[in-house]
Amino acid sequence: MSTSLWLNNLEEWMNEDYIRAIFENVRKVNYYEDGESGAILKTCCIEFESQDAARNALERQSTQRLISGNPISLDVVPEWQKPSYYMLFISNIDPEVSENDIKYLFQRYNFISARVLRCVDGTSTSIAFIWLANESDIQNAQVEMQGAFCLKRSILVHSVKSDKNTYLSSPGFYGTPQPLNQFTDPNNTAVYVHQLPENITTQELRSYFLHFGEILYTQVNNNSGRIVFAQRYFAEQAINEMNNFPLHGVRIQLSWARPPSMALLPSKQSTYWPALAAPVYPSMKDVPNNPFTPFSPINPYYAKSWNHTASAPLLPPGLKNGSDYPYLSVPPDILNDSYLAMCEAVNSRLDAESTMLLPVHYSQA
């Protein structure tokens, strides 16, 4: 590690004396100015007397605040050098995660820098960016660190690079979604338990996890088990707290499992109507396959028609046929009869009101 660190949120009133007051063992402070305007940049280089002093300042930055209340942003590289490295976007991080926690998690991938996005008051937004040296490290980190735990939450790793042609070539400008797995699926609530004792039963395993939340399904088979919770938050808590938990003298290991088939879950009579088909624009030939888009194109004619489905939809409880279901397609004969009856009624009314209209003169009393 170098003995120099970069302060990337330098404020106008911060002079060298103030920087020496908030950091220990400072040897030199270098300021930089714009070559054209002559204005001092919001980045300065701080040289410490030793590598240990620089490392201590970097580790303590998450607990320090400036007079204005903003958190200190120390980094090993300046802001203008970061575009030359490869970047990843991380979401769903714990509010207490700092840059040092992310560094320890990704340091085996040629880690360069990390930044946690914070609000004005210094609270975390649960979003962070990391910079790595090589493109291969980016690809490996995106696959291997997907769903990894950092403090109390499993993080989601996203690639920042995007191909413009990918979005323009897709129907309706919808990008091709990334495939979901058991780590990234936001609806996955299944937990896999490894290294279970041989004499443990399904009910006993269920009793150890009931305090985390509602459990839909539990199974024990060949020293392993599967637990399906009602919500993902319950599963995250269980993995975080019960991993390496000693059970009958054996430490169990927990990880995400593949979502089970709906046939395994207990069936319940539902009184809800079937969901409508996904609406699309008339210019689109297919239903958008991106489930994360905030946009919802509306086409009421397509939404009320089930002709595009391969099989008839499920009917609500109590209906023996689809005649009373408002979203099933109406037979053409009924539509034709309704149209002819409406035309006949309009013509009859026009004939009845086709008498000559005479002007009416009101006499003034």
UniProtKB/Swiss-Prot annotation:
Q: Does the keyword Nucleus apply?
A: yes
Give one GO biological process term.
mRNA splice site recognition
Q: Which UniProt keywords apply?
A: Nucleus, Repeat, RNA-binding
- Location (main, coarse): nucleus
**Phenotype when the gene is knocked out:** Leads to lethality.
Q: Where in the cell is it found?
A: Nucleus
Residue ranges the record marks as coiled coil: none
Gene Ontology cellular-component terms listed: cytosol; nucleus; U1 snRNP
Looking up InterPro entries in the UniProt record yields:
Nucleotide-bd_a/b_plait_sf, RBD_domain_sf, RBM42_RBP45_47-like, RRM_dom
Q: What is the protein's name according to its record?
A: U1 snRNP-associated protein usp109
